[in-house]
């Protein structure tokens, strides 16, 4: 799975825009295997700690290699609830 495909898969399942700081077509050899999205009342920090950071560790990356961007193009605070971030995207 390429980085681009991984980012798109996360967005389709979680409705959260994640940017991984690697070349878009670099192979990651890992996939995003979760079937259900994280609940709306969870914070961005919880989402990253439980889902994204463990995946980055498997790829061999640190937490500094990922960003989350809301629908306004901003980097939300780590304590922002996911429903706020999800509702910021144009549907």
Task: Go through each PLM region and give its residues.
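Basic helix-extension-helix modules of the SAP/HeH family
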Residues: 1-91
């Amino acid at each position: 799975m390429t980085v681009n495909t991984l980012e798109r898969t996360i967005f389709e399942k979680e409705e959260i825009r994640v940017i991984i700081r690697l070349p878009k077509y670099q192979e990651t050899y890992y996939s995003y295997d979760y079937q259900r999205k994280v609940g709306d009342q969870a914070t961005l920090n919880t989402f990253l700690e439980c889902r994204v950071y463990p995946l980055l560790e498997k790829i061999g990356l640190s937490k500094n290699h990922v960003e989350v961007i809301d629908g306004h193009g901003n980097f939300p605070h780590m304590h922002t609830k996911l429903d706020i971030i999800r509702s910021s995207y144009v549907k």
